[in-house]
Amino acid sequence: VSNNGMLMSDTQTAYVLALQFNLLSDEHTEIAVNRLVDNIKNYGHLTTGFLGTPFLCHVLSDNGKHAEAIELLLRTKYPSWLYPVTKGATTIWERWNGIKPDGSFQYPSMNSFNHYAYGAIGEWMYSNLMGLKINNNFPGFKRYTIRPLFDKNFDNIDGSFNSNYGKIAISWSRKKGDLKLFLNIPANTKADVILDKNHPGNWAVSYTHLRAHETRG
């Protein structure tokens, strides 16, 4: 870390890894977050690869830059997650541009069209858009956190996870300025629900209990 708080390797991946693994002081963390955002804006896109991409949007959302993470998610120009979709992709590719803008292909020796790495964005979508977060003190989703980050680009988010205790289901919707959050909490589990501080207001709560024989397990 230099005297002005910047990393000696001034790349998106360097900042992402330093922030993800808490390698910086509080003062340097703020500088690193701002520098990461500036770097993304200067390039106009992400520049991370297999190491940095799985943590990029997590780092942005965890440090108050969720809007910037959403912007990366919804980008359709290369390099981005949705660029392959514009080329007809139904899987995650090994390269951001496995099919080039002119329709030609990259060299087949490194051009898998079913590759794991960039698919890590799915976990971020589960834990931030849907809002299901693991509590490391309670393995197996015995207790967990539900903290969806509502965003103006989405009117409906709906998802579920089949835990050992049953299905955890989360959905939220927006209509005429009102937000509605629906949860399904399996029996014998606990959920800590945290509402986005950027959407203050009054929340009306209603719930229904299911009898044990009505649940799976």
Mark where each language-model region is.
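Active-site core of glycosidic bond-cleaving carbohydrate-active enzymes
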Residues: 1-182, 187-197
